[in-house]
């Protein structure tokens, strides 16, 4: 799948954003994350063109603007960031991931994993700052009203949630005031959100559910069931 998306992107027919599993693949390929069977990444690393694929992958964005009214990230945009701030902070991490000096990349990957800090402040610095940005854009599901992250919950919207925390998209969003937000990551949602300006396009396809597509031109959603599982 990665090779196919790269071919499409090379022709200008596709674009992608990085998610938590992509970062795990990159870290594993650099020898900075233990590769587990459930990650299903070893075949990519061992492929004849594996190095080229991973080098291409690490140079992809965390945040993409398909048009002037739309933001795409893997996990979403926290309520405390507007569109401009989201783009600027994403670029900070993207610059490190795509750095020509691989020691700069490795230094970040070695410190990328962790759930602290769990609340954004503008005075964060170094790898803590980069980790916090990465967690918001690739791991976020629940936050509190101040934007603090909660990582343990992965269930459906109907399940009980930790006190004080809600799905990030249930809080008034600065970015959604000016842009439509698209995200994946949270397969248990199966495409459900409560906001017309925030769309989930992870239908749980890898778990045997649906593959979701959304046509921006006319705001039309399409869903196809997984015929394999």
Regions found by a protein language model. Give the residues of each.
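Acidic, His/Gly-rich catalytic cores of divalent-metal-dependent hydrolytic chemistry
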Residues: 87-229
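Active-site neighborhood of divalent metal-dependent phosphoester bond hydrolases
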Residues: 1-3, 7-126
């Amino acid at each position: 799948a990665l090779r196919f998306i790269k071919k499409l992107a090379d022709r200008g027919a596709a674009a992608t954003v990085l998610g938590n599993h992509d970062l795990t693949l990159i870290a594993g390929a650099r020898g900075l994350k233990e590769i587990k069977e459930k990650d299903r990444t070893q075949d990519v690393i061992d492929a004849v063109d594996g190095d080229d694929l991973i080098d291409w992958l690490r140079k992809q964005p965390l945040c993409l603007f398909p048009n002037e009214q739309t933001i795409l990230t893997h996990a979403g945009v926290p309520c405390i960031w507007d569109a401009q701030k989201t783009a600027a902070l994403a670029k900070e991490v993207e610059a490190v991931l795509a750095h020509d000096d691989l020691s700069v990349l490795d230094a970040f990957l070695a410190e990328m994993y962790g759930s602290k800090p769990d609340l954004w402040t503008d005075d964060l610095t170094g790898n803590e700052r980069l980790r916090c940005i990465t967690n918001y854009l690739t791991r976020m599901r629940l936050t509190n009203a101040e934007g603090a992250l909660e990582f343990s919950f992965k269930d459906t919207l109907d399940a009980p949630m930790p006190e004080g925390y809600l799905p990030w998209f249930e809080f008034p969003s600065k970015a959604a005031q000016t842009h439509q937000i698209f995200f994946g990551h949270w397969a248990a949602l199966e495409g459900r959100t409560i906001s017309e300006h925030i769309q989930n396009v992870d239908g749980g396809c890898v778990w045997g559910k649906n593959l979701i597509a959304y046509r921006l031109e006319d705001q039309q959603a399409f869903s196809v069931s997984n015929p394999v599982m």
